[in-house]
Amino acid sequence: MNTIYLVPFFLGTFSGFLATLPIGPAKILAVRKFLLISKGNENEVYNLKSSNTILLASLCGLIFAQFLFVLALQFPFLYSLWVKPHFFSFFFVLVLFIYLYQIKNIQFDISNNQFLLKSESNFSYQQAAFLETLLLQLLNPVVLPNPVFCRLTNVFLFRYSTISTFFAGNFLGLLSGYGIFFLSTLFLLKRLEEDAPTIYRLVKIKIHQFFGIILVIFSFLCLSRTPLPAIKPFKLKEISTTFSSTKVWYENIWPDSFFGYDRWKRPLRLISVDEKKSQPNNELKPFNKMFFSQFFFEGGIQDGNYRLVHNFPQSLSLISQNINSILNNKLNNSQIESIEKNKNFIDEWIQEKKNRQNQISQNINTKIKHIEKGSYLEELVEKKFSSFDNNKNKISKQMDPRLNADIRGKKFFFKNKSFLFLTKEFFSKKDSLFAVEKKNLIDTYTKNKFKLFLTENSQNLSSLETRTEKIPFITWKPIIQSFYDKNQNLKETSLDQNNVVKDQLDLDGLKNKRSWHSLFKKISPPFSSESSMGEKLINFENELKQEENNSKMAQIYKPMPLWNLNFNKKELNLLKRQSNNKLHLKIFFPKSNHLADRQNFVPPLMPFFRRNEFPGTITSRRGKAVCWNTFQKKPHSPLFIHHLNLLKNFFAKRKKIQINQDVPTKSWQSTSKLFQFLRDYLLSLQAYIRKYLKLPFLIIIKNFIRQLFFQPAEWEKDWTNLSKEVYVQCDFYGKAGSVGVKLPNFFANDEPKQIKIVNPFELRFWTRSFSEQSSLQESENSSFLNVWGRETKMPFGKVKKSPSFWQLFIERIKLILQYKILKNLSVSSSIDSIEIQKEIKNPRIQSQIDVQQNFQIEQSKRNLGTKDEEKVKNLNKKIIDNNFKYKTTKRKIVNNSTQNKTFSDFNKKEKINRTRQYTFQNMSILLQRQWFHFYRLFLKKERELFFELQTKMFEMKKIISRKNTKVIKIFLKLFYNVSRFLRSLYYQISEFFNWLSLKFVKNQKEISSNIDAFDLKPTKNLSQAYIIHSIWEDRMMSRPNITSLMKSWNQNVSLKNNLENFLNKQGILGNEKPENLTEHQWQEWLKNFRVYTPSLKLWALWAPNYWTQAVEQYWKELPSSKLKSILNQEPNKINKSLNFTTSLDNSTLNKFLEPHLPLFQAVQKQKKLWKFNILSRNYTEVTNDGDIDSFFSWQTTDFDKKTHYLFDTLKKVKGKDKNLIVSPINLSSLPQIKENKLKRNLSQQNIKKELPLIQREKKRLDFDIKLQTLRQRGTFFPVSTRRWKLKKLKNKLEKLAKTVIKKPQSGELSSSLTIGEKNKKLIRELFVAENRLFTNILENWNSKVLDDELLMYNTISSILRFANKNINALAINNSDSLSLFPRNILRPLDLNFLLLEDIYLPTYLREMKILEYFHFEKENQNIPSTSTVSHSHFSNKKEKTIYAETINKWHLILQQKQNVIKDRQTIVRFLWPTHRLEDLSCINRFWLGTANQSRFSILRIQTVPNI
């Protein structure tokens, strides 16, 4: 079975088994019945073996009751029978008294230890056990605490509830759980009976004595939880039910009746509130589920139906809306196949994306120019905005109102009383639910202030000198603020107006030809925030106000019942003292809508339960009750709504029966005037056509046909029947108005009409006689005319069936045929008629005939004796009718004969006909008898033949099966051998092709992403983003542990299969033990492993001294003879024939770095350009992969070639490098300080200060190189952090934060005012001093994570172990059922597109990266469009040509390695991220630090269908 169906099946069995774990009263009752029931005899005890059926019957009652609960989820009217409190309270009392009576009937004999019942049959025991457990389980969910029902409801609200396998698994889990309970009770009681019979008897006695009393007491206590309608009011009349719409009882859904806030099914205790003290009950916790609902129901914009909505935090709403705004999808997933066939659409789509790519590149160039002019980088970085309003203003995202800026940093306190005693005026106020007060604590908002302060005052802080150097200490960047934080902190920013970029510049690409109004419609949020009362879309400007945010909070706020009246404490204390802590105050509320004064309350004494809570109108032993406001909003879930129509239609049919049938179901008010006029005109035309054209024409044709058949015409009868037809003009609803038909007038304001026909004309071929018409029942005398000229029973009803035209004609033909048949069967001649007449006149013969007739009648009565008398009467009636028809024909024949013959001839014929009639009856009786005997013999012979045929067929099959068994075995052996031979051939051929592919693809490095080959169908396995995130998480931790991930990794995951393929190509898969791989093998493999290659930004943080160490090693290996030639040459000239064999002393290092001083000076002038390069170029241009290759070159044997090529490119530029963009990884070790304070000459002292760090790094790397295998490297212990230093650092940072918070929030602050001497000392100790805490802790932390090769070893070794245990490696390579990549493309795994750092990027840089991976240019074009962007800022043409030639070589090398992407594949690649929202949210919840991150699971829930 497929894994898509297996996973829900196992989940269903597990959840169904969990539903049976709690032991409720129904199970205890089943065990009691199992113990106590006896057979009924005095000397026989009911043993366990014979009582198994009773326990089984009781468990069947449990299962059947739970099955009814499951049906109640789909059919709410079933559950309404026992949930309604009136019915429930009345029914439950009767059940208890019946059970008490049954307990009294059980007699217990103490001497014999036997239990006796009055009933004797075992069936009564089983039936009683079934009914008792069934009724108790049905009454359990409301009266008794029943976790089984709660678990069942949670199960069916799960995401797999619509899958049939999940339902089957759930039912199987229920059966298995109860089966285990059945077997366990049997085993325990049997062992107890055999090992300790005395204890077994004592248990029976005690259960009989105390079980009934305890059960009844417990049931009555639980019954007190629900009010009885005869004693207590079922519903409070004084509550204003403005929000509850009046509905019929069967239209309400069962959660409304079960959790309705206006129904007293549960006692409600009011929490006491003390206004003077800030108790924890008063404080509103915004992220607590007790105060706010996670799910609520809102009406949709399109159809107005209610849908289930989830309250999203901002961390998920960012991804869901950014993808829609970036991708801008116009079509659904089902239309992708039709799109691929349309080439015109593909061309338009590619051209549109090219234009967008050029637009983004132009914006990058404009930002670079403004950076060169001196503007701040923070102003040019794109802010994360989601959409635009109608005025083209940016609006930030606020899906969850609790995360907005006006609510952030504040506390909420309850301001309302209990919801039971609120008036209409209270709900009209918007700010009536809660009041707002500011916090005085340090929250995230103040921490953000501290970071902003440090970044803005970096100039003042950097002026602090330590001995001889100036080093900046700010290593972080300010958090990207929301739109609200920007508005609140405008006064605190210290930006100069001269440096601010003007608004007229098109930096963000807003001046686009595309209409933003249409774009705004496409970027509508997928999870809307409409109110549940069906309000319209809220204006975006009003959302910024605090009142609107409070109204949104009110929608998801669940009010708790509170009571904060100001009672006099002295009076309460007196009451308590008088009652000796046994009595408590009870408050009775008046019936008025408003709260009464304190004088109107009567304080009677009630039982006090030693709780500081007011019980309200009902007292009980319950704690605090939270009234769930989510269920008050009518939870119209699709599980309940689409079944309500069945009940509504059932009651609607009953109402329609009582209504008059003449009243139509439609209404004319909604129709237009033109439509009414056309319909009335057509009706009147149909009436005229029917009366004057149609029916007269049919009458003429009918009579003409009758004359053709030599029948008399019926003109008079037809015209008289037609004259009886009357046309009555009625209103729209069928009420009679006036006789006659008139044409309607268009200009008259008349109501639409109906035309009624009284005594409608029925056209028949043969009109009935008067006697026949009187015998038949008259049909309906009226009918309505249709627009099509047809008759209906009622207006707008079904078409009336017209009588058959040929009915009487067919009846007459039957009579004629019967007469002719009788005439042919008569054999007697006309000569014997006289003798027959004489014999008939003889009385003896006449008596014989009468005797024969009587004998036949008696014989028929005997045959029909077993039948009912009614059938006999019906048979007699049929005989009489046939005789009557025969007589009518005979009379007509006689009338015709009298015209030509005499009276004597007539007498002769009459005598002959009588004799023929008698002879025909005798012959028919004989024929019936003979036919009966013949049919009986035929059946016997048929059975005998059928039996013989079956026996012969069985014998033949037996013989054939015996002979063919040997032949089948031979064919099976042949098939097995052939299949085995083919498998071996397939194995050898695949090995040969793998060997060829390894040789062909071994030295290639493909960079093109493989997103186009991803399947569009969603998989049910582990998501790829979750795997990548877990790998990243292990990388960031101290000790990586990937084995736990691989245990849950499914066998058919496509990402795992492709990793296996790639390892097979690299030659690593063949090793049985991956622990013994050498370092060189792993380095050769890691340089092509593109998926887990971190970005340049992360390498700069993890290994800042790696580049300096490599440069130092390079200059040490230079021979001394070559150094002199370098010093004598020009600074930028480098000899190509350098040999890297010897080394150099550290003392001459400064001299050798002098030729590269112009490069360092150019880099120092462009400090801001480096930052922007990290943000934009490294994430948008494909050419930056060369930097990663250059980084890997220092680990490989191709070191000489790569370095030689790099220095050769520098020689070609030759001093033209003022504005040259150099890779940021080459400058990660350089300090970033201001341009005007940078020293142009690098002194030897600064180099010596950094040499100890290099020496330290060298020792660590030398230690790693000495280790031969990765297994030994796994024993490397990381540097341990010092906890006391961390605590010291934390305390000092808190002191600095307090000083910043206390300062005034206005303008730019000078260093003399903001920074004191103590704070300067703290800053020096933390950041500037030699033994600074901050940098040391970071270095120790980086040393843990730096060993990335060990991480790769743990990652891939777990995959190899998984493959060696389960499946052969070659079988995995050939399985392509769920493969991500096509079989015809043999290339290594390359997924740079899925780097996790992309989530940090702003939207428009992420879009640029996606567009760069599409490669829209043609095949013959070697230089992509991005190359123009990189050298567009050169001033001279020569510089452009030199730089273009150097970069074109890199592009040519890259394009040789890339596969050409087709146009159709680009669209598939572009649409791929829309099917991966779940993966992106899975990553996003770990990266963005927002509250309540566990709610990302809503993306796993299926979209709720239309209701």
From Swiss-Prot:
Pfam families xrefs: Ycf1
Source organism of this protein record: Staurastrum punctulatum (Green alga)
Protein name in UniProt: Protein TIC 214
GO biological process, one term: protein transport
Taxonomy, superkingdom: Eukaryota
UniProt keyword list: Chloroplast, Membrane, Plastid, Plastid inner membrane, Protein transport, Transmembrane, Transmembrane helix, Transport
Transmembrane segments: 4-24, 53-73, 81-101, 129-149, 163-183, 202-222
Classification via InterPro entries: TIC214 (IPR008896)
GO terms for cellular component: chloroplast inner membrane
Protein role: Involved in protein precursor import into chloroplasts. May be part of an intermediate translocation complex acting as a protein-conducting channel at the inner envelope.
Compartments, as annotated in UniProt: Plastid, Chloroplast inner membrane
Similarity comment: family membership: Belongs to the TIC214 family.
Membrane topology of this protein: Multi-pass membrane protein
Entry coiled-coil feature ranges: none
Subunit-structure text: Part of the Tic complex.
